[in-house]
Amino acid sequence: LACNIALDAVSRVVIEENGRKEIDIKRYAKIEKIPGGTIEDSKVLDGVMFNKDIIHAHMRRRIENPRIMLLDCNLEYKKGESQTNIEMMNEADFTKILQMEEDYIQQICADIIRFKPDLLVTEKGVSDLAQHFLAKANISVIRRLRKTDCLRIARAAGATICSRTDEIKEEDIG
């Protein structure tokens, strides 16, 4: 059984370039141990596996052949880089600042929704407001995924990791 699994894993990660066969197990294969079960339960998965859940209860958990978008930026309002003090004299000032934050989140979500991905994976955080807009657009979201896992997804899905939502192109979707 162990030999069959090893042979199966190696045969899936063989890369042929310029007539040369190359096997890079460290880069293209990962062993994931899940507690419980028996050795007979072991298997080789063709794809990427990670242990993260979607961020909103109303987002889809099972998606066949998803369009995947990968981001390495926050879907939150940018807080000041340094200590920022804002003096608000009345309620209108506070309302104006809240509206600016909401408009910013709405714009970055619109940039994403325009491409109609089924799944959005980001290495950073996602605000509650962004979760709401994306759930309404039927886009499932996974946040705070490790860079290495994002790179594996990019390689498996043929996607590109984007740093800004306003720079996303159709070719970046996997």
Please report, for each region that a protein language model flagged, where it lies by residue:
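Extended amphipathic alpha-helical scaffolds
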Residues: L1-G174
